[in-house]
Amino acid sequence: MNKYLVLLATLFMGMQAASAQNLTQGSLEVLRSQQSVKVVVDYSNAIIMDMTEAEFAEYEEDWYKDQPTIISDLIDEVNQRSGHLLYMSAHRESDYTLRWSVRYIYESGDIVSDFYLESADGEVVAKIADVVGEGGAFGTKLYRIKSGAESTGRALGKFFKRELM
């Protein structure tokens, strides 16, 4: 009996995690008139494999070198999965910025994040909470994190497509 309860609880929590992202503040309506959105990443409050970002950077010497690839992996997946409704870029200036606020990165590379859509003056226009991306099963820590970024991008891209179509 207890085995079945544990199994049911696990299935329920897995289903919640798979559909966890939701718009918890504001509206995405402003994006309908935009052609591009700048994307930045914020690790300032992140716990990365039980370490702060600074501690993880000491442990993993390629952390700062690999960050452009990590954000690029996320952006590529968002652009593709959203059906190219918007052009997301880490380098193009825009009226709006999407701030990827990473909360947790687990050993598996799973990433839990919030996303904030901010106007040019820094006002938060919308918040998308609890976006979960699954990391990789094999490889180095950075490889698993990159897999988590891709998965996060897929989830966010599908969310944008659903919300903006």
How would you label these PLM feature ranges?
Residues Q21-V30, D121-M165:
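C-terminal/domain-edge helix-coil "capping" segments
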Residues Y4-M15:
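Sec-dependent N-terminal signal peptides
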Residues D73-H84, A155-E163:
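Structured segments of extracytoplasmic/periplasmic soluble domains
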Residues Y64-S72, D76, K146, E150, ...:
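Short, well-ordered alpha-helical segments
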Residues Y4, D42-A46, I105, A120:
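Generic structural motif
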Residues M1-Y4, A20:
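Positively charged n-region of N-terminal signal peptides that target proteins for export
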Residues S19-S72, K161-M165:
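A structural "domain/chain start" motif
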Residues R81-Y143:
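Surface-exposed short loop/turn segments
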